């Protein structure tokens, strides 16, 4: 080529031609052919410490290559899969370490389905409960034929995983702070009061940045009073970087909301979600359970036992989803609860996520799991809106005040009344948590009150 421009980095990479199957390059004057895949080109550039490539007379930065119409193929999930496998291995996950050791000689393993299918299963198994299930969905969408619908659902689901990952950490912090307040009083700052009160009272569903702001305030609160963190690895989070990543994810999702998204938006949000999950890799250290029932069992001359019936949320070692299990322990745990516990600890040592996370099926006395995260209060009557994570639909829970209408014996005998009573208990827990957490809050006057819209 007559017109060669010196690129930034230690090496010059010039794209000579692009075919359906390959990219022909000139690397420092030496011809080279690689697979036609954006991830493969990125890997080569990373290996050579090159920040740019040249095609004809134009220089493209790393961020521009994916956006330019160069005929380079772009495959969903490639970046996500490779980066998360490396992060999980660094976090100590033995199966990820073994996998990477086995494929070490295969430099482009992330472009071969016989390797990536195994890696994707390991990733979904590693991440806690509902996050692993949602990652499986993202990977399934990535395999679908390219369409406008695929692009939209991919962006939506990447955004949902980011939101739910931050929410899960916030719920663990709120629950732990609620427990801490049983024995000691803590004073909230003005900003903490404002953000936490908004969490309990807002009639509008929060976006990702709002959840990150709550996380920032809760971490500051725990640090100021030296309260033990519920997830010990939380001190490793770089909150400034998490804020920056979340801001990018929010902007990319906003493009979808305005119907301004393109194919490139999918790859950009996949990259940012990957960075967010690497920040929150601690979520691979925990498990989620939905406790369905506890049965007391004691025989003559034998110690008492508690038979725990629960659903292990997420993907198990055989890659089944939401597996029902039974365990026998010498102590009870809270029933009708979704709990979080460290993988290397007994589930009797847990964080009770209720009423912020509920299993709707448990409340309805139905089999299986239907996990819902608290979303907002209803705009008209202040009832509780919960988001069903499978499809982001809203389950509204009203307060029926059943104990004022019936005695407990009558409630237990009637299935419908008992179900409504169980939902009442969620309301009661939610209000108890709000009242205690905000008991010593700063009373500001700038909250937007939407209570009287329908009065």
Where are these regions (language model features)?
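Histidine-centered catalytic/metal-binding microenvironments
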Residues: 253-272
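Intrinsically disordered, low-complexity segments used for protein-protein interactions
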Residues: 25-27, 32, 36-43, 74, ...
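Long C-terminal appendages of very large multidomain proteins
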Residues: 297-455
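Feature for intrinsically disordered/low-complexity regulatory segments and propeptides
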Residues: 65-248, 267-288, 298-319, 415-419, ...
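Long, low-complexity intrinsically disordered regions enriched in small/polar
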Residues: 1-60, 64
């Amino acid at each position: 080529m007559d017109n060669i421009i010196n690129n930034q980095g230690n090496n010059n990479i010039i794209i000579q031609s692009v075919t359906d199957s390959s990219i022909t390059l000139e690397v420092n004057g030496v011809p080279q052919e690689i697979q036609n895949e954006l991830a493969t080109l990125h890997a080569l550039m990373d290996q050579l410490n090159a920040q740019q490539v040249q095609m004809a007379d134009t220089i493209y930065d790393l961020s521009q290559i994916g956006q330019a119409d160069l005929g380079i193929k772009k495959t969903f999930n490639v970046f996500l899969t490779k980066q998360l496998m490396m992060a999980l291995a660094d976090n100590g996950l033995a199966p990820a370490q073994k996998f990477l050791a086995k494929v070490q000689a295969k430099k482009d393993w992330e472009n071969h389905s016989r390797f990536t299918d195994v890696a994707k299963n390991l990733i979904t198994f590693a991440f806690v409960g509902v996050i692993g299930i949602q990652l499986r969905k993202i990977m399934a969408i990535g395999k679908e034929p390219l369409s406008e619908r695929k692009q939209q659902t991919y962006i939506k689901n990447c955004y949902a995983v980011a939101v739910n990952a931050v929410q899960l950490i916030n719920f663990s912090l709120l629950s732990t702070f609620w427990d801490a307040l049983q024995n000691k009083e803590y004073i909230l700052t003005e900003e903490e009061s404002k953000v936490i009160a908004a969490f309990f009272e807002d009639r509008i569903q929060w976006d990702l940045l709002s959840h990150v702001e709550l996380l920032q305030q809760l971490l500051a609160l725990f640090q100021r009073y030296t309260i033990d963190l519920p997830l010990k690895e939380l001190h490793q989070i770089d909150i400034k970087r998490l804020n920056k990543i979340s801001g990018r994810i929010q902007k990319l999702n906003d493009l979808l909301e305005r119907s301004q998204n393109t194919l490139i938006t999918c790859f950009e949000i996949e990259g940012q979600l990957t960075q967010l999950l690497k920040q929150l890799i601690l979520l691979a250290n925990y498990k989620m359970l939905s406790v369905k029932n506890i049965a007391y069992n004691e025989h003559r001359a034998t110690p008492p036992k508690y038979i725990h019936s629960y659903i292990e949320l997420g993907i198990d070692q055989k890659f089944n989803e939401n597996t029902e299990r039974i365990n026998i322990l010498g102590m009870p745990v809270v029933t009708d609860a979704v709990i979080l516990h460290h993988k290397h600890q007994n589930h009797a040592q847990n964080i009770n996520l209720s009423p912020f996370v509920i299993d709707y099926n448990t409340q309805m006395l139905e089999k299986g799991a239907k996990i819902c995260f608290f979303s907002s209060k209803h705009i008209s009557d202040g009832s509780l809106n919960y988001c069903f994570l499978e499809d982001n639909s809203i389950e509204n829970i009203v307060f029926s005040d059943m104990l004022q209408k019936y005695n407990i014996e009558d409630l237990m005998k009637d299935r419908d009344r008992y179900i409504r009573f169980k939902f009442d208990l969620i309301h009661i827990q939610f209000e108890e948590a709000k009242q205690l957490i905000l008991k010593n809050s700063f009373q500001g006057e700038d909250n937007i009150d939407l209570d009287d819209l329908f009065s």
